């Protein structure tokens, strides 16, 4: 059976992740639109997931979703370079469409991970 190579670039889009996060910073209402679509684990870049998680925490605590509060929520996870990249990214209008795309890429990554685990699981010895 031939092994097919998977183009990992189709499984994430860092620009799209940054655009979603930038849109939330510019308008916290965008977070309400995608709150039920995305989780922090859907972001390919762990730092983006951490920022998203901090945004959700701010929303849940009725705090403004802005850099000062995000920095406090992130604590030692705060990365100024990552935050500057997010802030420097243009916001998007249809944040829900982009969130669905990120979710789809996350699901595909999970499927690839499972597919890679199957051969080793199949070849494991079962206890008698």
Predicted regions: what they are:
Residues 1-107:
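Noncatalytic partner-interaction/assembly domains of nucleic-acid and motor enzyme complexes
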Residues 113-128:
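Non-catalytic interaction/clamp surfaces of large macromolecular machines
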